[in-house]
Every structure is written in structure tokens, then in C-alpha cells.
């Protein structure tokens, strides 16, 4: 389905990359909220964020100040002129935010993963004209992400955007949440006019990763950033390690290199022709490989052999990984390529054996 979309920009906010939404992970006290907001406003930022209700993985942690925090956001709006935003997870949250005059809402990752919860929020938003951003679900499921956007769009909301905050994983070596950039890139391909805002705070999980992730986001051509900024991050009641001060945030934003999204030159066109030729050759060679795989499938059927020959598969992965490394390619990338090729070969051989 095609989404009916309108710009999410708010009056007085310049329509340029990056759109920046900044503020603390959680609204903790009125003083903390106002101090952070005033410092961000002094840096020229126009969009303030703060979590009012905080869904935690386990009970017992700080779960937000609740409705009381909405009054603090109203005061931020009054004192600084900034637009204010927060996360909603239930219909009641939506009603309370609309009553308080919140300017922008977002749906969190845990909520996006639950179609029932998303539909409840969509129903509560019917007849309302407010920008809504939808975070990716915690698991890497593009269809679930798009489905949440469709539900809210079906409720009549056209000022929609997506937030990419990475995906949960047991592998925490570098990132708190794996970026898996191919997923938001595919979202951009599928819905080209949908703004994509990235959340380097949640992807990185550490403040030292915020700056490089911000630059990577801009280099990929995404629209904006939602960044956690706290007046005293080390004392934050939630996600302290990934928050930065307003001064540090200002420094990061001033260092960003914003490259042009579209500018085709003659040299670039020639290089793209070479890429197209390589891709054509790849497809021809893959088709040839699959024909041979089908012949092998026929042989296995005739000789009552199992499809999976583990020794041969391990040999292919090891040899191709070494060959790729000699050609300057990442061994893990080569492994993934040949895993995908092997999966398709097995599928085609299964068809032959089951005929």
C-alpha cells in the first residue's frame, strides 16, 4: 500500500537536513527538564524531547514521572518557544498528550512490535493533525515497521516519519542495538518520501559513539537525528551512558559534514555503468551456478543422497572466505554471500528431490 504523506516540518523550523530532536531520555524533575531545554534552546535547537512514560525491560527501574511531566513540557514550550515531543504507548498517553498540547509524538520500539497496541494508538489519533514518528520494532522486521506506519496512516494521519534506533541483539560488542543499515535503506527504497530520523543514542549505547553515528546517518542521506541530551548526563536516572550535554551536542552538530543528496556527474555516471555491468555478470554467473546446483540435485535424487553435505559446505565457506580476503574483501561478508547462495541451492535441490 502507498502511504499518503505530508511534510512533518513545524512552523519556524527550517526544512533542512538534519532535523534535530534533542532532550533527556527521561523527564526526571522540573528543574532538570527546564535546565536542559534552556541550554538546548540557547544552541538554536527547536525540537525538545523527553520521555514521560518509560517502558523498561524489567520492573523496578525508573519508569517515568507520568502525567506530571507533561506540565513541565508545557512550561518548556512557554519559556523557550521550543516544540515539545514525547513517546506514547497507549491510548491514554495519546489523550493526555493532546490535552497538554504536545507538538510531536513518537511510538516506541516495544510498542511498534505489537500491532494491537499500535492500532489502539492509531484509533486514539483519528481526526488529529499531529506529526507522529514510528520507531523500528526491537526485532529486525521491516514489514512490522511498515505495518505500524500503515495503521497510523489509515487513521488519517499524514505527517509521518520513521525513527531508526537499531535492533536488539545478544551481540553487544560495539553497539547497544545493531544498526543493520540495510533495513532503513530498504524502507527508504520502499517509501521514498517518508522522512527517516536516526537515533544514535540508542544504536550506540555509549556517548562516544554518538558523533560517528551522526555522521554516518548524514552520509547515508537520512533526514534527521533524535539525540538524548541531559544537563548532567552522569546523574541521569535512565540510560546515563548514552546521553551527552547540550554543549557536547552542539559541538557534534557543528562538526557534521552534510553532503549533497543528488548530484550526478559524468564520471559518476560512467562508474555506475561499470557497476551495472558487474551486476549483470554476477547474475549470469549465479544463474549458471544454480543450473549446476540443479544438476547436482538430480544426481543426489538418483543416488538416494541427502541434500546437505556438511563437509562440502564447510569447504566452500572456508575456501571462499580465504579467496575473498586475498581480494581485499571482508571474510564475514563473503560468508554471508555464500550462505545465501547455498540456501537458494538447497531450496532448488529440494524442489527436484520432492518432485
Question: Where are the language model's segments positioned?
Answer:
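N-terminal amphipathic alpha-helix/helix-capping segment at the start of soluble metabolic enzymes
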Residues: 1-21, 75
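Catalytic alpha/beta core domains of metabolic enzymes, predominantly
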Residues: 13, 117-251, 255, 260-266
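Hydrophobic faces of well-ordered beta-strands that scaffold small-molecule active sites
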Residues: 18-24, 46-50, 84-86, 105-107, ...
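Active-site mouth loops of central-metabolism enzymes
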Residues: 18-35, 59-61, 82-88, 108-109, ...
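A structural motif
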Residues: 42-45, 102, 157, 222
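Glycine-rich, proline-tolerant flexible connector loops at the mouths of alpha/beta enzymes
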Residues: 49-68, 231-240, 296-307
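Catalytic beta/alpha-barrel core
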Residues: 65, 81-94, 103-118, 130-142, ...
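Domain-level signature for soluble enzymes in the chorismate/prephenate branch of the shikimate pathway
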Residues: 261-355
Amino acid at each position: 500500500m502507498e502511504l499518503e504523506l505530508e511534510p512533518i516540518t513545524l512552523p519556524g523550523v527550517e526544512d533542512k537536513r538534519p532535523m534535530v530532536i534533542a532532550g533527556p531520555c527521561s523527564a526526571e524533575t522540573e528543574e532538570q527538564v527546564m535546565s536542559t531545554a534552556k541550554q538546548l534552546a540557547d544552541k538554536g535547537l527547536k525540537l525538545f524531547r523527553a520521555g514521560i512514560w518509560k517502558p523498561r525491560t524489567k520492573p523496578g527501574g525508573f519508569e517515568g514521572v507520568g502525567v506530571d511531566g507533561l506540565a513541565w513540557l508545557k512550561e518548556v514550550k512557554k519559556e523557550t518557544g521550543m516544540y515539545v515531543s514525547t513517546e506514547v504507548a497507549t491510548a491514554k498517553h495519546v489523550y493526555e498528550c493532546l490535552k497538554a498540547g504536545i507538538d510531536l509524538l513518537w511510538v516506541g520500539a516495544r510498542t511498534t512490535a505489537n500491532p494491537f497496541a499500535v492500532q489502539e494508538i492509531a484509533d486514539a489519533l483519528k481526526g488529529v493533525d499531529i506529526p507522529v514518528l514510528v520507531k523500528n520494532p526491537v526485532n529486525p522486521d521491516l514489514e512490522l515497521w511498515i505495518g505500524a506506519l500503515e495503521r497510523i496512516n489509515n487513521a488519517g494521519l499524514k505527517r509521518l516519519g520513521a525513527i531508526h534506533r537499531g535492533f536488539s541483539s545478544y551481540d553487544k560488542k560495539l553497539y547497544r542495538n545493531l544498526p543493520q543499515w540495510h533495513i532503513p535503506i530498504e524502507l527508504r527504497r520502499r517509501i521514498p518520501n517518508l522522512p527517516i530520523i536516526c537515533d544514535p543514542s540508542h544504536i550506540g549505547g555509549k556517548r562516544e559513539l554518538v558523533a560517528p553515528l551522526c555522521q554516518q546517518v548524514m552520509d547515508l542521506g537520512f533526514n534527521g537525528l533524535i539525540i538524548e541530551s541531559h544537563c548532567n548526563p552522569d546523574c541521569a536516572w535512565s540510560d546515563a551512558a548514552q546521553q551527552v550535554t547540550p554543549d557536547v551536542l552542539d559541538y557534534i552538530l557543528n562538526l557534521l559534514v552534510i553532503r549533497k543528496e543528488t548530484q550526478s556527474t559524468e564520471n559518476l555516471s560512467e562508474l555506475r555503468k561499470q557497476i551495472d555491468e558487474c551486476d549483470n555478470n554476477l547474475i549470469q554467473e549465479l544463474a549458471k551456478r544454480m543450473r549446476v546446483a540443479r544438476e547436482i540435485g538430480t544426481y543426489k535424487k538418483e543416488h538416494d543422497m541427502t541434500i546437505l553435505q556438511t563437509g562440502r559446505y564447510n569447504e566452500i565457506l572456508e575456501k571462499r572466505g580465504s579467496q575473498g580476503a586475498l581480494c581485499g574483501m571482508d571474510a564475514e561478508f563473503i560468508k554471508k554471500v555464500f550462505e545465501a547462495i547455498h540456501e537458494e541451492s538447497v531450496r532448488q535441490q529440494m524442489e527436484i528431490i520432492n518432485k
